From Swiss-Prot:
Belongs to the bacterial flagellin family. Keywords: Bacterial flagellum, Coiled coil, Secreted, Virulence. GO terms for cellular component: bacterial-type flagellum; extracellular region. GO terms for molecular function: structural molecule activity. V.cholerae is able to differentially regulate the flagellins within the flagellum maybe to produce flagella which are particularly suited for motility within a given environment. A flagellar filament composed exclusively of FlaA is fragile and easily broken. It comes from Vibrio cholerae serotype O1 (strain ATCC 39315 / El Tor Inaba N16961). Residues 104-129, 314-341 form a coiled coil. It is found in: Secreted; Bacterial flagellum. This is Flagellin A. It comes from the Bacteria. The gene is flaA.
Amino acid sequence: MTINVNTNVSAMTAQRYLTKATGELNTSMERLSSGNRINSAKDDAAGLQISNRLTAQSRGLDVAMRNANDGISIAQTAEGAMNESTSILQRMRDLALQSANGTNSASERQALNEESVALQDELNRIAETTSFGGRKLLNGSFGEASFQIGSSSGEAIIMGLTSVRADDFRMGGQSFIAEQPKTKEWGVPPTARDLKFEFTKKDGEAVVLDIIAKDGDDIEELATYINGQTDLFKASVDQEGKLQIFVAEPNIEGNFNISGGLATELGLNGGPGVKTTVQDIDITSVGGSQNAVGIIDAALKYVDSQRADLGAKQNRLSHSISNLSNIQENVEASKSRIKDTDFAKETTQLTKSQILQQAGTSILAQAKQLPNSAISLLQ
């Protein structure tokens, strides 16, 4: 064994291993204290890139879930207001049916109409005041809104809200009134029993309806018979004995053509009708009350269709949230496997590094004493 004092190779070797053990000890302590296996790019460059992408996706999913919940909140707010609007329309329908009864006097019908007008005002108030985050939902100004329900661009759904004001054209339709009044003694002539209705629906479907009325039916029986043949429009009789037809707004596009011998007998003409909405309802007369029922039925159908659409959107958003939550769970699990510290493994590494550090320190101390052997040779 060579003994020298200029170069202590043993000490240098011990110091190298001590430095390595200390570095590993520091790394283990950093990982255990931070909880992250990757604390800088030098720990795992590829793993850092992957974990950062997964972090961005997870954060995006978290925001998307909040966005979806906001969409549900808007839908719930609008649907709750529409529920109250439905209750108002149901009450107005009750009033119209009550007013159509022949036992009511003019003053009684006027009282019923006053309540109906007050309900129309409340219908408008609900439409104008229902809002979410400062945006009006049911007065027609909301239009459509896009809800970002994904962690990447383009992952959105569109929710639209329309007006449910009493004067909205979709809350009604068109009315057609015969020119010739008929008394109770009148009956459908055997030579003029045919009625033909031709019109186009909003969805583009062409409708041709041929009706052969019953010979001898009076005007009220005729209205009942027509209603039994179709649900696309409603027939009723006003206080003067005139047949009136009401067509809900979604069921007609353009002219409503009426022809046939019975149409001529009644003076029932087609063409563009008189547009009527819930705002135009007047139940101070039998005819107005009868027509009001058709208008309100059309309005109820319209509001119900809007509520159904909102319900479908809520269900879609709820399923979207469940899916986003599942994706986020798996993304976080993947990120954890890449970036998080395995405490069992790292604790073992810490113990190993501590032992090696202690051993290295002890060996280095002994190695530093080796040059002293040269002094003993000089004595």
